[in-house]
Structures are given as structure tokens and as C-alpha cells.
Amino acid sequence: MKLIIATRKSQLALWQSEHVAQILKNTHQIEVLLEGFKTKGDVLLDSPLAKIGGKGLFTKELEESMLRKEAHLAVHSLKDVPSFFPQGLVLAAVSKREQSNDAMLSQNYKDFLSLPKGAKIGTTSLRRKMQLLLLRPDLDIISLRGNVNSRIEKLKNNDFDAIILAMAGIKRLNLDKQVNFVYEFSKDELIPAASQGALGIESINDEKILELLKCLNDENALIETSIEREFIATLEGGCQVPIGINAELLGDEICVRAVLGLPDGSEILKDKRMIKKNDFKGFGESLAKEFIAKGAKELLKKAESMI
């Protein structure tokens, strides 16, 4: 049997798809091919993600290729995957999670506190912008789009004093070797995006294919990301609004951190809970409902009007 993986053409997307292809080849001794596509999010690089809006910026074209029967599966950064899938497609697996926290890359400053007043910080994310300004209102947060290599190039050209990336991508592409300093944020400093660090394998709804993809599943990643995705789905928040949610398994307990608010950090809702591992089902939804009772929907609407 031959499997075809639909993938974006960015360096990180290709790494992720090759990684999954290798596991499938080794486990099942089958042929696995990659088919590259450009998504809307890859093409529209002049505008901040939040302004482009819409769900599935990095997934829609890959999903369409599967629905046209040109591919059997697609490998996504799970944080880019909307909560609901087109008919005929399913979330087949969530693979073992890489580190889920964010990090600061810089040529001149070894950590976040050493950044000078007014330092220029590059990031695509309103979630990061909101939390960075909470920690350091004196910073200048500037929108930064493009692939990872072009972002690092801009940093080296001194367009920015620092840029913020997900630690998972830094590790997968060995980006720490390309810059002088990498400062890892704790999850209390910067709450990550839902499902950050996890790969989501989306596939056609076919029994044989789903059986082959079972080997990619990781139970811990499934538990953590199900809480996070449930929280986002209940709030109806896409990746363009400032929401952070992270569930971290610690033995038989789970630490859940959540934050949302306005991009400038002037108004936020934030919480941190410890729950029993066995109580994870439905917790994301119930936490989101508590946030809604405190005015989360109104706050997110206000955030959208500021974008």
C-alpha cells in the first residue's frame, strides 16, 4: 500500500511530515510519499495573521486535496487546526508532544529582562503580544510574518532586538545554533497557544487508513490537547484572537493555565488550576464557561475590534 501525505512546503512543515512518514514506513513497511501545497497563510505574508482572519489559514488547501482524493492524510501543527473538520475528514491522531512553551531568540540580549526599554520584538501572535506587554509594557511589539529562516535573517540584520518563536519549532529545526541567545519562557510568564508543540494528523475517514495511523497516537498528548481544544471550541476562538491555554500532565495531576484579553494587555482574564488526571474530560469546556461568565465573549469581541 502507498500513503500520500499532503504538506505545506515550509521547512518546519516538511520536517513534521517527513517525521510522520518515517514512523509510518518503519512501523508498517509501506511506501509514503509527500505532496506539497501552498496554503492561504503561506501566500498572504504582507498582512498580520489576525487581519487576514478566517479559520483554516494553514489547513484548507491540504483538506481540499484529501477531499479530491489526491492525498490520504495531512500533518499539521495542531495549534493551526480548527476545532471542527469538513465532512469526510477526521483528526486521526495526535502525536507525542514536543516542548509547548515559547522562547525568545536574540543576538544581543541573553534574557527577557535584559531587553532595553523600547526594544523591538517580532511576533506573529496577538496572544504573545498581549502577554509580553503584561510583563513589559515598555516594549515595542511588531508584527513579523514569513518562514522561520526569513525571521531569523531579519533578527540578524538588526531589524529586531528579539523575536518570539515556539520552542518546538526551534528544537525541530535546531534554530538555537543560528542565534547567540535563546531564552525559554516559563508557562507562567507566557501561556502557550492551544496544542502548541503537538502534531495533529488529519485523514480521510477510512477504516484501513485510520488503523495504520493509530501508531502515531500519544495518550498524554491526547489528554492535554483535548482540554485545550475544548476550551477554544467552547469560546469559539480561532488562532487569530489573544487566547492562551495549556494543560500539562504532572504525574496523576494536570496543571491547566488559561488567559485571554485585549492585544495591548489592558484587560485580561487569567486562571491556573490543578485537576486530577481522571477528571480531564469536559474540563476545558467547564473552564471556558467560567471565563464566559466573567465576560470572556465580550472581551474577545472587543479584542477583534482592535485588530
Swiss-Prot record:
Q: What is its EC number?
A: 2.5.1.61
Q: Which SUPFAM superfamilies does the UniProt entry name for this protein?
A: Periplasmic binding protein-like II (SSF53850), Porphobilinogen deaminase (hydroxymethylbilane synthase), C-terminal domain (SSF54782)
Domain of life where this protein originates? Bacteria
| Entry keyword set | Porphyrin biosynthesis, Transferase
Query: Where does the secretion signal sit in this chain?
Result: none
Names of the cofactor(s): dipyrromethane
Q: Which InterPro entries match?
A: HemC (IPR000860), Porphobilin_deaminase_cofac_BS (IPR022419), Porphobilin_deaminase_N (IPR022417), Porphobilinogen_deaminase_C (IPR022418), Porphobilinogen_deaminase_C_sf (IPR036803)
Which GO-annotated molecular functions does the record name?
hydroxymethylbilane synthase activity
Q: Name one Pfam family in it.
A: Porphobil_deamC
Cofactor annotation remark: Binds 1 dipyrromethane group covalently.
Under which pathway is this protein filed?
Answer: Porphyrin-containing compound metabolism; protoporphyrin-IX biosynthesis; coproporphyrinogen-III from 5-aminolevulinate: step 2/4
Matching CDD domains:
PBP2_EcHMBS_like
User: Its Gene Ontology biological processes?
Assistant: protoporphyrinogen IX biosynthetic process
Which reaction is catalysed here?
Answer: 4 porphobilinogen + H2O = hydroxymethylbilane + 4 NH4(+)
Q: Which residues carry this modification: S-(dipyrrolylmethanemethyl)cysteine?
A: C239
What's an example GO cellular component term for this entry?
A: cytoplasm
**Alphabetical list of Gene3D superfamilies matching this protein:** Periplasmic binding protein-like II (3.40.190.10), Porphobilinogen deaminase, C-terminal domain (3.30.160.40)
Q: What else is known?
A: The porphobilinogen subunits are added to the dipyrromethane group.
Q: Which family does it belong to?
A: Belongs to the HMBS family.
Q: How does it assemble?
A: Monomer.
Query: What HAMAP family does the record point to?
Result: Porphobil_deam
What function is annotated for this protein? Tetrapolymerization of the monopyrrole PBG into the hydroxymethylbilane pre-uroporphyrinogen in several discrete steps.
Q: What is this protein called?
A: Porphobilinogen deaminase
